[in-house]
Amino acid sequence: MTRPFLFTSLPPSMNRFDRDGRNIGYDYQRRCIASWIDCGFDVCSINAPQEEIPQEFAKLVRVEKTERDASEIAGKPLPYLQDMIDVIVRVTAGSGGFALTNADILLSNETVDISESVRTLRPQECIVEPRMDFAVMDKISEGSLYPSGFDFFAFRAEDARSLSLNRFVFGRPWWDYALPLSACFQGWRRKRIESPFAFHMLHDERWDRKSWTKFGDCFLDEIVLPRAGRIPPDRFFVRYANEVAPQPLNSGFKTRTLKNILNILGFGSRQAMLGRLARLNASMLSRW
């Protein structure tokens, strides 16, 4: 049986600290890679041309390079999301299910055969799942749900051909909203995995307001506003919300949506606008 690919972008180095303050980043990355392989995936790291991953890891995974990097807008040589998708389509020969996840995600197959779930994806069916955060390695099972984004995605390669996400960067804000919402707006169906299987070790946040705002603007320009057209904001976002949900949303959620949307489309500060939009995305995608 063919093993599906899991794609990621391994960094040249990773920092994670245990309860005694020791940097266990290298070992943690090794554990992540081992978990992907143990869960039944062939692993491929997609990196920018000048990025070199540790030799030990390069022996465990396939490494593919993009032709360019996003240094100019991301501040470091990260791959563009669309370039990664193009590589994925090439590596998979344009067919079959594949997974895409962040490099610091540990997978577990204790409660679900996740690679089989990916391998058996039907056309225009996808997996979009959040992670469970944990603080120390020996207490992974005590992790808590991360409510504000998504870390594990799976699609069919022939469907991925239709995605156009040219301005987003893997590893920078908003790509994890842009990818699933693009799929959702094309009418793809979400295949839910009820049992937690993606885990993430907590670390100091490297949140960058400038980067968050910059790519939030890209999200508005590329994902939201093209679908708004000349429809009044309230009507557009009722439709936007209902496109994401398999069933019409209850009136309470619609009301909250409408209260937020005037700010999202230009009233109030840009930061407040993007913050509300991020929360709206997370809420709607959880109902998809």
Language-model regions: role of each:
Residues 6-14, 48, 64-68, 104, ...:
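Short loop/turn segments at strand-loop or loop-helix junctions that form parts
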Residues 26-42:
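Short, acidic, metal-binding catalytic loop of nucleotide-sugar glycosyltransferases
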Residues 16, 48-98:
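Active-site-proximal specificity loops/subdomain of glycosyltransferases
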Residues 4-14, 25, 169-288:
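C-terminal catalytic/acceptor-binding lobe
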Residues 95-108:
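Short beta-strand-to-loop acidic/aromatic patch adjacent to the donor-nucleotide binding site
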Residues 105-181:
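Conserved catalytic core of nucleotide-sugar-dependent glycosyltransferases
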Residues 3-9, 36, 42-45:
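Hydrophobic targeting segments
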Residues 14-27, 71-76, 168-171:
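Short, flexible/disordered intra-domain loops and linkers
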